[in-house]
């Protein structure tokens, strides 16, 4: 009797996977992982931050606080807040890094009684405009001329380039993050123009350094309005317009309508200077955005796509300038378009 072949008795042995096929499978897996990483890098939203609006009016929550706390009173500010060192000074306030219940906080003190009206105006705006776009108020004492706010260690927006040059922040030094900062800035302007306190104009903005000093850079790399001492009201219905200060302004950073219109032959007189509206803030958007975009790979590409809206912002006729909402929507479209283009290129490479 003829013997059956051994392999027929035991069934077919499992086939070995050719090395080339295994390599292709590994490459496919790596491409999938790379795609997911790119998808996260370009599309994932920022880590959310605590919004003070989650607390009732007159309350706050910072850091790891689970519950909202009422604004601190004069007595609490005097006894619970420990002043550490001065970290800033302006015409209206001196700012001190301080400590409250193991939280780093910013204590602002009035510089001189001559500036008290501006100080109280800033306090009123800070109280009334609390929300995602404004630094968190922790307490105040009008008797002592003090205001307590949340402390942000990265400081003023003026420090942006210095901060992004640090090695630990290189991962956020991209055109995507910088364009998002520009969107934050325009969002703040849009909020001020449609605030619960009416249309407010950011008057402390006569040059680039002064403008940047009005805002804070958070550890989450977003922007907050911080100095609200000069936010006059525009009311188009009643014809109420504004003038930013009582001195003659110069340069091309300020809007044309902020310049003395009667030539060098006539000395400046405040009572003859025409007033203006919130469109002066729109004029300044391209210059602020250009600073925020910096000079890194991809920033000129973003500038190119923003050229038309920025040209409109620089219209000599205020009424022809876009609104802050128009600018914000254009920024969002540009961000989406460029992000999709980069993702498409990344997919083609995989």
UniProtKB/Swiss-Prot annotation:
Residues modified by glycosylation: 165, 220, 235
Query: Family, per the entry?
Result: Belongs to the protein kinase superfamily. Ser/Thr protein kinase family. STKL subfamily.
* Protein name, UniProt field: Protein O-mannose kinase
- Residue intervals annotated with topology Cytoplasmic: 1-20
Keyword Membrane attached: yes
Q: Which reaction does it catalyse?
A: 3-O-[beta-D-GalNAc-(1->3)-beta-D-GlcNAc-(1->4)-alpha-D-Man]-L-Thr-[protein] + ATP = 3-O-[beta-D-GalNAc-(1->3)-beta-D-GlcNAc-(1->4)-(O-6-P-alpha-D-Man)]-Thr-[protein] + ADP + H(+)
The segment(s) forming the Protein kinase domain are: 81-350
Free-text function comment from the UniProt entry = Protein O-mannose kinase that specifically mediates phosphorylation at the 6-position of an O-mannose of the trisaccharide (N-acetylgalactosamine (GalNAc)-beta-1,3-N-acetylglucosamine (GlcNAc)-beta-1,4-mannose) to generate phosphorylated O-mannosyl trisaccharide (N-acetylgalactosamine-beta-1,3-N-acetylglucosamine-beta-1,4-(phosphate-6-)mannose). Phosphorylated O-mannosyl trisaccharide is a carbohydrate structure present in alpha-dystroglycan (DAG1), which is required for binding laminin G-like domain-containing extracellular proteins with high affinity.
Q: Which domain of life is it from?
A: Eukaryota
> Species lineage, top-down?
Eukaryota, Metazoa, Chordata, Craniata, Vertebrata
User: What does the entry list under GO cellular component?
Assistant: endoplasmic reticulum membrane
Q: Which residues lie on this side of the membrane: Lumenal?
A: 44-350
Fetch the InterPro entries from UniProt. Answer: Kinase-like_dom_sf, POMK, Prot_kinase_dom, Ser-Thr/Tyr_kinase_cat_dom
């Amino acid at each position: 009797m003829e013997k059956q072949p051994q392999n027929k008795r035991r069934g077919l042995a499992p086939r070995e996977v050719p090395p080339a096929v295994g390599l292709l499978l590994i490459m496919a897996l790596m491409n999938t992982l790379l795609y997911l990483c790119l998808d996260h890098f370009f599309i994932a939203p920022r880590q959310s931050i605590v919004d003070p609006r989650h607390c009732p009016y007159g309350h706050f929550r910072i850091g790891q606080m689970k519950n909202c706390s009422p604004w601190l009173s004069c007595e609490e500010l005097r006894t619970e807040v420990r002043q550490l060192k001065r970290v800033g000074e302006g015409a209206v306030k001196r700012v001190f890094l301080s400590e409250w219940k193991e939280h780093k906080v910013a204590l602002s003190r009035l510089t001189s009684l001559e500036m008290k009206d501006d100080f109280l105006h800033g306090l009123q705006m800070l109280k009334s405009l609390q929300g995602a776009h404004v630094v968190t108020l922790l307490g105040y004492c009008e008797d002592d001329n003090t205001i307590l706010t949340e402390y942000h260690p990265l400081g003023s927006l003026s420090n942006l380039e210095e901060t992004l040059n640090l090695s630990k922040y290189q991962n956020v030094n991209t055109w995507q993050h910088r364009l998002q900062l520009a969107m934050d800035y325009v969002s703040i302007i849009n909020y001020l123009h449609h605030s619960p306190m009416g249309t407010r104009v950011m008057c402390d903005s006569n040059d680039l350094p002064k403008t940047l000093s009005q805002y804070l850079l958070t550890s989450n790399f977003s922007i907050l309005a911080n100095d609200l001492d000069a936010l006059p009201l525009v009311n188009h219905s009643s014809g109420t317009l504004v003038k930013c200060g009582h001195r003659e302004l110069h340069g091309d950073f300020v809007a044309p309508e902020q310049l003395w219109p009667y030539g060098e032959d006539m000395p400046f007189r405040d009572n003859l200077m025409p007033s203006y509206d919130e469109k002066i803030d729109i004029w300044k958007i391209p210059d602020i955005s250009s600073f925020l975009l910096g000079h890194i790979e991809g920033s000129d590409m973003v500038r190119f796509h923003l050229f038309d809206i920025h040209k409109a912002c620089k219209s000599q006729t205020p009424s022809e300038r876009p609104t802050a909402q128009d600018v914000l929507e254009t920024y969002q479209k540009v961000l989406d378009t460029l992000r999709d283009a980069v993702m498409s290129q990344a997919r083609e490479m995989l």
